[in-house]
């Protein structure tokens, strides 16, 4: 809400500035007289630039000024929105190929390995709350399924299968919200969001009992709309905890990033237990970028990130949770800068949600919610949404999110080009990786979907 009010205020000021500029240019015979007094514009008259050209110059100046103000506003106040495409990060375009061609080639040639089930049981993000206004309908692909996510006039968010059981129209494409129901754009059938039952067929005398669309168990918490998946249709056995500072409005939305990763879902959270990779992949300063061919360039080797990490699972009743404790230090020219030390608690809740909690003496407190949602068996949508203390200037959390994004995209380059190894060659210092795999296996059931090979094709 705070960002919405700021945006509306800026738009109002921008419209007022444009209107005043236009009135000024139209009504003043020579704007340069008014702007600079009677003496300075004499040069304009002698060179023939008085009148219309001066008005044009004033318009250009006003336009440039407004553009600069808009850029400054976005930099200082607007949330950071950085959304990457499927082939935008982690692929090397060589020999005249585009990134898309390189990505397709990698996916086609990569050995998939012996994979765990592709859709673990748990809670998954489908949308951020601010993306779904009252009366909105969104089409989302999650866990290989098309769903329609809509917000009823009662303000509640609902998730149902996208395809109408009548004749298969997509409820999210042209469908509209009526009260707490979604109306099919094809024949006007209306389905209740709370249970999926059809409550109205415009041309039928009676609505049959069997007329219903699948309704996904869902909840809205911490600024996220989440759905529950269990391969056997079981009800949720645990909940995603509430971050009370978000609910009370003490921490406000400051931005999000979104990436698509071509890998098995388990590979992404497994990074938390892969302690050794931090020293090799994430030590170079963020100024050295994300392309792993150049991150160890001598140009930027004077900046280093140093990490101390511990990963551990939580005991009952929170066995579905784990924790990674991170201590970060920055060195420049070999000198430690203690004011930039940062302690982070990364708490994973189930297979798809991680809370990255920050606390710093002068940079303030906040959380990045790291969410992994399977789109297809080997395609994950990963979002990072940051909420931060409202009293801290937005530039601070935006910088933190941008820095985290740079480090994350280094991992993306690895994930997008690696294969899953079910029996990896590990040394004793890698013991946390095996512990993590045993912990993560609790989210699989006997009937969890698997990827199968048939005649060199993937059949799901």
Curated annotation (Swiss-Prot):
Domain of life of the organism encoding this protein: Eukaryota
Subcellular localization: Membrane
Alphabetized SUPFAM superfamilies for the sequence: Bet v1-like, ISP domain
Transmembrane segments: 8-28, 60-80
PROSITE patterns assigned: RIESKE
Positions bound to [2Fe-2S] cluster: 164, 166, 184, 187
Alphabetized UniProt keyword annotations: 2Fe-2S, Iron, Iron-sulfur, Membrane, Metal-binding, Oxidoreductase, Transmembrane, Transmembrane helix
Listed Pfam families: KshA_C (PF19298), Rieske (PF00355)
GO CC field: cytoplasm; membrane
Protein name: Cholesterol 7-desaturase nvd
Pathway, per record: Steroid hormone biosynthesis; dafachronic acid biosynthesis
Role summary: Catalyzes the production of 7-dehydrocholesterol (7-DHC or cholesta-5,7-dien-3beta-ol) by inserting a double bond (desaturating) at the C7-C8 single bond of cholesterol. This reaction is the first step in the synthesis of the steroid hormone Delta(7)-dafachronic acid.
Molecular function as annotated in GO: 2 iron, 2 sulfur cluster binding; cholesterol 7-desaturase (NAD(P)H) activity; metal ion binding; oxidoreductase activity
Protein family according to the UniProt entry: Belongs to the cholesterol 7-desaturase family.
GO biological process terms held by the UniProt record: cholesterol metabolic process
Catalytic activity: cholesterol + NADPH + O2 + H(+) = 7-dehydrocholesterol + NADP(+) + 2 H2O; cholesterol + NADH + O2 + H(+) = 7-dehydrocholesterol + NAD(+) + 2 H2O
Membrane topology listed for this record: Multi-pass membrane protein
Rieske domain location: 123-227
Enzyme Commission (EC) number: 1.14.19.21
Cofactor: record remark: Binds 1 [2Fe-2S] cluster per subunit.
Cofactor(s) required, per the database record: [2Fe-2S] cluster
């Amino acid at each position: 809400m705070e960002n919405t009010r700021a945006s509306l205020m800026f738009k109002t000021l921008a419209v007022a500035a444009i209107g005043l500029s236009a009135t000024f240019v139209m009504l003043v015979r020579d704007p340069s007289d008014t702007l600079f007094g009677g003496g300075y514009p004499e040069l304009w008259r002698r060179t023939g630039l008085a009148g219309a050209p001066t008005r044009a110059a004033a318009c250009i100046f006003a336009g440039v000024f407004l553009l600069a103000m808009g850029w400054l506003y976005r930099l200082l106040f607007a949330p950071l929105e950085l959304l990457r495409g499927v082939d935008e990060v982690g692929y090397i375009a060589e020999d005249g190929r585009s990134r898309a061609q390189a990505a397709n080639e990698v996916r086609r040639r990569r050995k998939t390995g012996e994979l765990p089930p592709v859709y673990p049981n748990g809670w998954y993000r489908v949308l951020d709350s601010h993306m779904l206004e009252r009366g909105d309908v969104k089409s989302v692909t999650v866990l290989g399924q098309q769903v329609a996510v809509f917000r009823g006039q009662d303000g509640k968010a609902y998730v149902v299968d996208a395809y109408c059981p009548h004749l298969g129209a997509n409820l999210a494409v042209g469908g509209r919200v009526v009260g707490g129901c979604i109306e099919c754009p094809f024949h006007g059938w209306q389905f209740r969001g709370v249970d999926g039952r059809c409550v109205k067929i415009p041309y039928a005398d009676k609505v049959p009992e069997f007329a219903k669309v699948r309704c996904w168990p869902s909840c809205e918490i911490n600024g996220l709309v989440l759905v529950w998946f269990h391969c056997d249709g079981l009800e949720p056995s645990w909940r995603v905890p509430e971050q009370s500072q978000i609910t009370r409005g003490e921490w406000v939305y400051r931005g999000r990033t979104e990436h698509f990763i071509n890998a098995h879902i388990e590979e992404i959270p497994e990074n938390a237990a892969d302690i050794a990779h931090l020293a090799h992949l994430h030590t170079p300063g963020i100024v050295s970028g994300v392309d792993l061919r150049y991150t160890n360039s001598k140009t930027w080797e004077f900046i280093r990130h140093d990490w101390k990490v511990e990963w551990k699972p939580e005991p009952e009743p929170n066995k579905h949770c784990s924790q990674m404790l991170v201590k970060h230090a920055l060195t420049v020219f070999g000198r430690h800068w203690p004011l930039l030390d940062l302690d982070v608690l990364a708490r994973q809740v189930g297979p798809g949600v991680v809370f990255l909690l920050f606390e710093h003496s002068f940079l303030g407190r906040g959380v990045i919610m790291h969410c992994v949602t399977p789109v297809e068996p080997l395609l994950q949508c990963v979002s990072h949404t940051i909420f931060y203390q409202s009293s801290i200037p937005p530039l601070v959390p935006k910088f933190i999110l941008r820095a985290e994004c740079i480090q994350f995209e280094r991992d993306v380059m690895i994930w997008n080009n690696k294969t899953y190894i079910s029996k990896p060659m590990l040394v004793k210092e890698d013991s946390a990786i095996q512990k993590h795999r045993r912990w993560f296996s609790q989210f699989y059931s006997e009937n969890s979907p698997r990827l199968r090979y048939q005649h060199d094709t993937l059949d799901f």
